[in-house]
Design a protein with these regions (language model features):
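A short, active-site helix/loop in glycosyltransferases that binds the activated sugar's phosphate group
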Residues: 4-37, 44-77
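Conserved donor-binding/catalytic core segment of Leloir-type glycosyltransferases
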Residues: 15, 58-111, 117-120
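Glycosyltransferase donor-sugar binding loop
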Residues: 104-108, 129-144, 161
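Short alpha-helical donor nucleotide-sugar binding micro-motif in glycosyltransferases
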Residues: 161-162, 168-172, 260
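Aromatic "clamp/platform" in nucleotide-sugar-dependent glycosyltransferases that forms part
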Residues: 180
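A charged, aromatic-enriched C-terminal amphipathic alpha-helix characteristic of glycosyltransferases
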Residues: 238-268
Length: 269
């Protein structure tokens, strides 16, 4: 806080990763517009990895066997299915018409995976939908307990940390991003780069910079009803894969680097 005030007072150039973050600094710390503050959005890199080692023979892990195996995992803290098994299950589910949601990020109160679980509890609406939560548990197992309590082992998968996300995005229909607060929302961009649309809250810092109607539906408020309605719309919508990829490419690591270099040159001129 003190640094931000001093930087504005002395016209010291700083950069932030989203327009929403800039607006919050101006409103909460400075009380006015900051001419020294430049927005340079985050970037990421798409890796075109080979998935050969994840492909297994048809029928080696049936749907029933995976669900039984996953139920056993749920009842033990910090235990997850093998990535290769989850890959096979998602591949099978996709082939059989399931709609698949991803929610990427460590499982915390702020990331708000709990709300996604509460929404998937409505199995009448989301009977044909599978949600995968990717990330380490940093919530003392609260989300895990809720999945067990609601008997959602057929609808919500705790996937754990996934260092091969690039080969999994092809299974995803919609990327959920329901954080309470978030500076930029890198998982949104990662999804875009693979042609995956996003459902997120209208009031997040990330939304202002990452909203494109071709790639995102915004939830107007934070109620379960609003998220459910928006998610249903997203799952029924005919998204254009290539258009979303083009939007994702606007946030590549190369473009981010170029913006920083140009900003630095401008500051030093």
């Amino acid at each position: 806080r003190d640094f931000l005030i001093k930087a504005e007072k002395n016209n010291i150039p700083i950069s932030v990763i989203s327009s929403g973050m800039k607006a919050r600094i101006e409103e909460n710390y400075l009380g006015k517009k900051a001419n020294n503050n430049t927005v340079i959005t985050n970037g990421t890199k798409k890796n075109d990895e080979n998935d050969t080692k994840f492909i297994r023979e048809e029928g080696t892990l049936t749907k029933e066997k995976f669900q039984e195996y996953y139920s056993d995992c749920l009842n033990q803290n910090d235990l997850y299915p093998k990535l290769s098994d989850t890959y096979a299950y998602l591949q099978h589910s996709k082939k059989n018409g399931k709609k698949i949601l991803f929610f990427v990020g460590n499982i915390t109160k702020n990331k708000n995976q709990m709300q996604a679980v509460e929404i998937l509890k409505n199995t009448k609406v989301f009977e044909n939908t599978l949600l995968v939560l990717w990330g380490r548990e940093v919530d003392n197992g609260e989300v895990r307990k809720k999945i067990v309590e609601y008997q959602l082992h057929k609808n919500v998968i705790l996937g754990g940390f996934n260092d091969r996300m690039d080969i999994f995005w092809k299974f995803c229909d919609v990327n959920l991003f329901l954080s309470l607060n978030d500076g930029f929302g890198l998982p949104i961009v990662e999804g875009y780069m693979h042609g995956v649309p996003c459902v997120t809250f209208e009031d997040l810092d990330a939304t202002q910079d990452l909203y494109y109607p071709e790639a995102m539906l915004k939830v107007k408020d934070r109620s379960n009803e609003s998220v459910t309605d928006t998610l249903k719309t997203a799952l029924d919508k005919n998204w254009k894969y290539e258009e979303i990829i083009e939007i994702g490419n606007m946030f590549s690591i190369d473009i981010m680097s170029e913006k920083y270099v140009n900003w630095y040159k401008e500051v030093m001129a």
